[in-house]
Amino acid sequence: MKALLDLFKQVQQEEVFDAIKIGLASPDKIRSWSFGEVKKPETINYRTFKPERDGLFCAKIFGPIKDYECLCGKYKRLKHRGVICEKCGVEVTLAKVRRERMGHIELASPVAHIWFLKSLPSRLGMVLDMTLRDIERVLYFEAYVVIEPGMTPLKARQIMTEEDYYNKVEEYGDEFRAEMGAEGVRELLRAINIDEQVETLRTELKNTGSEAKIKKYAKRLKVLEAFQRSGIKPEWMILEVLPVLPPELRPLVPLDGGRFATSDLNDLYRRVINRNNRLKRLLELKAPEIIVRNEKRMLQEAVDSLLDNGRRGKAMTGANKRPLKSLADMIKGKGGRFRQNLLGKRVDYSGRSVIVVGPTLKLHQCGLPKLMALELFKPFIFNKLEVMGVATTIKAAKKEVENQTAVVWDILEEVIREHPVMLNRAPTLHRLGIQAFEPVLIEGKAIQLHPLVCAAFNADFDGDQMAVHVPLSLEAQMEARTLMLASNNVLFPANGDPSIVPSQDIVLGLYYATREAVNGKGEGLSFTGVSEVIRAYENKEVELASRVNVRITEMVHNEDTSEGAPPFVPKISLYATTVGRAILSEILPHGLPFSVLNKPLKKKEISRLINTAFRKCGLRATVVFADQLMQSGFRLATRAGISICVDDMLVPPQKETIVGDAAKKVKEYDRQYMSGLVTAQERYNNVVDIWSATSEAVGKAMMEQLSTEPVTDRDGKETRQESFNSIYMMADSGARGSAVQIRQLAGMRGLMAKPDGSIIETPITANFREGLNVLQYFISTHGARKGLADTALKTANSGYLTRRLVDVTQDLVVVEDDCGTSNGVAMKALVEGGEVVEALRDRILGRVAVADVVNPETQETVYESGTLLDETAVEEIERLGIDEVRVRTPLTCETRYGLCAACYGRDLGRGSLVNVGEAVGVIAAQSIGEPGTQLTMRTFHIGGAASRAAVASSVEAKSNGIVRFTATMRYVTNAKGEQIVISRSGEAMITDDFGRERERHKVPYGATLLQLDGVTIKAGTQLATWDPLTRPIITEYGGTVKFENVEEGVTVAKQIDDVTGLSTLVVIDVKRRGSQASKSVRPQVKLLDANGDEVKIPGTEHAVQIGFQVGALITVKDGQQVQVGEVLARIPTEAQKTRDITGGLPRVAELFEARSPKDAGILAEVTGTTSFGKDTKGKQRLVITDLEGNQHEFLIAKEKQVLVHDAQVVNKGEMIVDGPADPHDILRLQGIEALSRYIVDEVQDVYRLQGVKINDKHIEVIVRQMLRRVQITDNGDTRFIPGEQVERSDMLDENDRMIAEDKRPASYDNVLLGITKASLSTDSFISAASFQETTRVLTEAAIMGKRDDLRGLKENVIVGRLIPAGTGLAFHKARKAKESSDRERFDQIAAEEAFDFGTPSAPAEEPQQHPAAE
């Protein structure tokens, strides 16, 4: 019977396609889609519920309501398939054709498509070269447009009001034609000759010089060329026929109580049909023009609402006063077609439940409740029951399963064996959020999860839920097992660290077991082996922490690598260790020495241990080891019985004295402030500093007391050992809590921040053990509340950032092994403030060297170019003291659509070179986005305690060596003989004997140098000191002070401190100055020599002038004698706000969005010499004269700080005016490498502040995508337009073609796009439309007649194909190869056949002409 039924099934052919094209539909095309015209607004008959004929649900047009049954019931059953009933006109076929058959409405008057009218920039306006307002006035019948001026002086496309029109008609009669409404616009569009227009525009573009015109012409040219290329006629933007959506896609559902629920589209269509029919009738009746015109306008508005309600005028509303949901609303936004249905589908064979911990599971297992498994694996069970003959039909099998008979449970066990399931925890922030496990059947209703995978899922057991998905096909099961099994994903793709690191109780247990105690029971005993130790421990002869000597057998790598030799050989050594460590040595994998365990295991150590195991012993051994570590950790933690009590929080006895001293200091500052020696701001800064330091000191005293305890050793001597205090052990091991939190429990809570980030100067001197008083508690609530509010707000921001990142990188896949480029970037250790923030080894690990790595001492090549630098290589490089290595980077990869494996380097989640097909773009986006949400959630952990680093006020050397100053360092010697720095960008370096840089420190303007160039110093020597709370203005010349424009009440204000009564002069902000004249002047100082002449800058005719910035406190008086290096004014630095990640997320977003910062610093456009020109009103003029003698001027606001002085040589791209850097300038002036370094370092700074590790290459991948487009500067012979932005790969392809044809290629500039803009300007319109601004993207694509080659992942998910990554990439490659080989074979056969029949091989279309026939 089944075979019989299959006979009648319609053959459904799966379409294989490689691209999707979008365009405008011509009226004929729309009619060809349609199955009939919808003439009536009726939907269904309210009594019979049958659709009305010719109405919106008409069965004749759209197909039958029931399968194989016509409406009147004359033809039923399959045998009449394809018959059209003569009575009701319905074709007998499947009812589901009502989902695909369209209808149409013939409009009585043409109507403009609102997308092409109102979606900015207006496409109609561009094609017609008219303004949007004018076109709108014509379309909505408020004005006439001239179509054919004839012999009159009128111009085509001229707009006239009705009055004008009647006057002109009286004047010229019917010599000209003007129209209103869409008919007029359609006529104009028809009249356009595109080819002619394109030619004229191209010539105009070449001849015009005005920027505005070039821009305008280029835009119009682009649109017209698009029409020309795609073969779309402009008049199709005006609709004559309106397609009607199939009825099943806009259903009408009867509710109980005789009411109906309907899709808004039906309402919108009804309005269109009603107005259209009324208009038809009015036209037949030859109604007065004004009535017809009104009806046409109403029709236009009805169609507008149907296509995009609310885009123009007020949105049409339904009965409930809500705007109706139009066709455009159906596809855009989070709930639209793209994001709701195409990118996010719900799937079958899935379930969800609460998770509980499963400590007995192996890493690759999960506990699945029996009832869930029964439901999830139903089809498999049915199949087995039939095969085994327990049930004969599916129905019988169903009954068996429902009754849950014994045989069903046996079958379930069998079905589940070796059939992995996938577990997912929302939010899935990176690829480890979904992993595959082998299910183990358990009782109860909760899923059991292995404790070690919790870190990857970010799961805890406080009520989290997880979803289970069953991979059905064999391929899916295979992929789940090989690629997604939890035991195959032990490294984080973000940084290559192990993800299966124990936490909390496991760490505590291992730490407790590996600690050592002085004079423990059985100390000093010797044992012949581990089994003896265990026996002694079980008989309570020794304690876990006792120091003992044990003979331990290690399995080490065999030196003998000949065939048949075992990989590991035993090695026996005697170790001084502790009982706990000896017991743990049992689980050590082969190939690891005991020394890795012979120390207290803290969380970091355990992570390092697992990492070492992975690198040395491979994946399998590591997974087994991690599992055993976990088992031991839990067991030992239970044995340890660590708990907390109030007495564990030891408050240091010195606390009172420390706090008392601080209070005295604060009082002293108050006194100084009262007597006017310091400003309010300085006092505040100092008070905050004192309390910060006090908080630190109390914390330190507390930690000292907590971390050690007095003991008596074996010889009866008093000594101190590391404490066994429970709280200390928890924090020290990294199990829970931190020093900061303990400080709040037992030290002092310290300073708190207000919600705006400023610090409250009264600290909380109490701690939680002593308890807070009401005021202290109240101050604390600020931080806690802010934390919660931040969390709520920022989770959304972080998710949005991830979404943008994924969107910009989703089409970046590794597609080949090596692109063969010789470009790369130079990597150095990252040094900040003299500290190595990131060592060179960490930056180059897993990269491919692009140049030979050479030993600096012997000049021999250590690693050839093209080597993948692994752990051994980077250790060797570090040992040799090489401080710079050039490596490949995704930025310079020359693969056209994607990346090559060599430029990407190691796949961090697998630990080997990346495979072809890896979706590295998405991995990069996830790696950057995932911690984003953690950053957001990490604000309130410290409970808002203001952790403010006391500001740096000096630099000291970290290593021995020789002091070297950079070329930019300049200093003068003052009257006291001190060296005062007067350069803005000077740096001091410490070099070793080989001249290799060991550290580098920025020395700020105004610092006092304590060591000079070339001095040999020891580590710890101070190099320079400065006042951290003010920025000085220093004179480089001596003389008598002469003020200019320093007028009280005009440019400066006398600030009399209301407390102290002392006065200082402060430069007033420009915005607050009264008169216009005073806004343009700048208070400054000139110096006079002994004769009263102005002091000149040596070698020039310019007088020395030193300007005061806004906010400067002037410390000298007019007529005062000053010496070289003396301070003229001080600028107080702002009170620092606490650094919270609040700055973090937005900072990352603004870097990736490539926003220009406000008040950006100015970079030198050229290399040359600086000089100052004549100042204008509010600006100073800086001139750079380049090497050819050309002058480049910069106008700089007076309050800005210029970093260069007269006659200084600057290099192109050097910062000349202080301020945050603009990434666009960096790209333009310093190039791609500098830009990438800037973005990578800035993003890393934010994450490093939070202690988050992300590999640089992820950020580089994103920067590559931001540089995806180029701007054409000279189009050569290509099809591009100058100034146009095009995809880099398109441009390279086009240039290759030009070179092949011996034509001129185009030249271009790099352009940096923000991630949102880059996503929207991608080649794939499907991907862009599903991201943001759907309407705009689709409008543009339709006009261009764009073709989407389905290169990215997103497009393929949307059209439902396998994604071109991983196994999907291989599938598509194989498919394409087969297609091309089939084509070749086909051509070959065709050629052979033609040859066999003896037909002439000439093409048949053109008959061969004999010369004689002419």
From Swiss-Prot:
Residues engaged in binding Mg(2+): 460, 462, 464
Biased composition (Low complexity): 1400-1414
Signal sequence, start to end: none
GO MF annotation list: DNA binding; DNA-directed RNA polymerase activity; magnesium ion binding; zinc ion binding
Class of this enzyme: transferase
Disordered, as annotated region: 1391-1414
Entry superkingdom: Bacteria
Record keyword Zinc present: yes
Cofactor: binding comment: Binds 1 Mg(2+) ion per subunit.
UniProt cofactor(s): Mg(2+); Zn(2+)
Catalytic activity: RNA(n) + a ribonucleoside 5'-triphosphate = RNA(n+1) + diphosphate
Entry GO CC: DNA-directed RNA polymerase complex
GO BP: DNA-templated transcription
Family: Belongs to the RNA polymerase beta' chain family.
Function statement: DNA-dependent RNA polymerase catalyzes the transcription of DNA into RNA using the four ribonucleoside triphosphates as substrates.
NCBIfam families registered for this protein in UniProt: rpoC_TIGR
Subunit annotation: The RNAP catalytic core consists of 2 alpha, 1 beta, 1 beta' and 1 omega subunit. When a sigma factor is associated with the core the holoenzyme is formed, which can initiate transcription.
The protein, known as: DNA-directed RNA polymerase subunit beta'
Organism per entry: Burkholderia lata (strain ATCC 17760 / DSM 23089 / LMG 22485 / NCIMB 9086 / R18194 / 383)
Lineage of the organism: Bacteria, Pseudomonadati, Pseudomonadota, Betaproteobacteria, Burkholderiales
